[in-house]
Regions:
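PRPP-associated nucleotide enzymes
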Residues: 1-100
C-alpha cells in the first residue's frame, strides 16, 4: 500500500512565474534542508517499492539523483543515473527516440 505523502507539500515551495509567466517551479530545497522531513520522504518512497524487490533505482537528472540515490540505498539496490547526452563521463548506454 502506498504511503500518504500529502504531508510533503508543506516542505515544497512553489515559485510562480519562474523564468516565464505561467510556469510554477517546485523548489525541493526546504525538504532537503529539513533532516526529519527528508528522512521521512526517503523512508516513504522506499516503503512504496520495498515489496517489488527492485534491483536498480533509476534517477532522472538532478532532482532524481538527490532523491533516488538514498532510496536505492534504503532498498539495497543499485542506482542508475539518467542524463542528457554528453553529461555523464565514461561508458554509457544510450537510447534514441522521437517525440510523438
Amino acid at each position: 500500500m502506498a504511503a500518504d505523502a500529502s504531508w510533503v507539500r508543506e516542505h515544497i515551495r512553489a515559485i510562480e512565474d519562474y523564468h516565464e509567466p505561467g510556469v510554477t517551479y517546485r523548489d525541493i530545497t526546504p525538504l532537503l534542508g529539513n533532516e526529519a522531513a527528508f528522512g521521512r520522504a526517503i523512508d516513504d518512497l522506499g516503503t512504496c517499492f520495498h515489496a517489488a524487490q527492485v534491483s536498480r533505482v533509476v534517477g532522472v537528472e538532478s532532482r532524481g539523483f538527490i532523491l533516488d540515490a538514498p532510496v536505492a540505498y534504503r532498498l539495497r539496490a543499485g542506482f542508475v543515473p539518467v542524463r542528457k547526452a554528453g553529461k555523464l563521463p565514461w561508458a554509457v548506454a544510450r537510447e534514441e527516440y522521437e517525440l510523438e
